């Protein structure tokens, strides 16, 4: 038995032992999960070695559940190595309304910025995917639930305008609870601003692919997330404007349909174009981008029709 085989067998035995019912097994399970060596799937309760889960793009190998990932992880998974060029890194949110709930909005921002090492809930920039240049934006749900404030909307609008000017395809990954209430109307106006920028991108006949990740709600759903020329979603994603509980309490007509607001339900109703597992997403995006690239003949010189001589038909 090679050394690698020995480690694989040891890992397998450890995984089996962690399912035991003795107090010692339970204590070790808690300790090793706390140490970050193992992660428990919230869907099937399977324990997976953290490194194995990372190699599988944070997708449970047992049931296919897609764990939530960060914006930097998403970019690392998708883009060609060394191709990422961030844009508008200097933009940071302020507190124009001096909003206060349980604590000042400015303090809440500082807490999330320290916790996530992000200035706001989206990363935008340029890169390449399988050698194809793209403009890409990825929302990060860790930052205030991925809520869209003035900076998030501004960065997405600027990215879209850059893609329009540079004739680049645009890819946006959504993960949001909606507009950021702490910024009031300044957050709501981002819906119109991002939608207008995307219309100009469409008028320039450039491709926009929207990718829905869990969860996507509120003003993000009501604006750029559902405006893609192609709308993709990861399996099991929850997508909607208001949550199911809010809808049930508002309309007062009992339970909503089973699986309401899931990606699978939306696909069956024709609201999205495809459900793509995360492990296949890079390949599928590359295929779609390649299909929509300008054809070679479009760059050839045009033919002067007057210089042609028509031959008589026999």
Swiss-Prot record:
Zn(2+) binds at residues 41, 44, 60, 63. Pathway: Lipid metabolism; malonyl-CoA biosynthesis; malonyl-CoA from acetyl-CoA: step 1/1. Belongs to the AccD/PCCB family. Residues 37-307 form the CoA carboxyltransferase N-terminal domain. Acetyl-CoA carboxylase is a heterohexamer composed of biotin carboxyl carrier protein (AccB), biotin carboxylase (AccC) and two subunits each of ACCase subunit alpha (AccA) and ACCase subunit beta (AccD). Keywords: ATP-binding, Cytoplasm, Fatty acid biosynthesis, Fatty acid metabolism, Lipid biosynthesis, Lipid metabolism, Metal-binding, Nucleotide-binding, Transferase, Zinc, Zinc-finger. A zinc finger (C4-type) spans 41-63. Binds 1 zinc ion per subunit. It catalyses: N(6)-carboxybiotinyl-L-lysyl-[protein] + acetyl-CoA = N(6)-biotinyl-L-lysyl-[protein] + malonyl-CoA. The lineage of its organism: Bacteria, Bacillati, Cyanobacteriota, Cyanophyceae, Synechococcales. GO terms for cellular component: acetyl-CoA carboxylase complex. NCBIfam families: accD. SUPFAM superfamilies: ClpP/crotonase (SSF52096). It is found in: Cytoplasm. Its EC number is 2.1.3.15. Component of the acetyl coenzyme A carboxylase (ACC) complex. Biotin carboxylase (BC) catalyzes the carboxylation of biotin on its carrier protein (BCCP) and then the CO(2) group is transferred by the transcarboxylase to acetyl-CoA to form malonyl-CoA. Pfam families: Carboxyl_trans, Zn_ribbon_ACC. It comes from the Bacteria. The keyword Metal-binding applies. PANTHER family: ACETYL-COENZYME A CARBOXYLASE CARBOXYL TRANSFERASE SUBUNIT BETA, CHLOROPLASTIC. InterPro entries: AcCoA_carboxyl_beta, Acetyl_CoA_COase_Trfase_b_su, ClpP/crotonase-like_dom_sf, COA_CT_N, Znf-ACC. This is Acetyl-coenzyme A carboxylase carboxyl transferase subunit beta. GO terms for molecular function: acetyl-CoA carboxylase activity; ATP binding; carboxyl- or carbamoyltransferase activity; zinc ion binding.
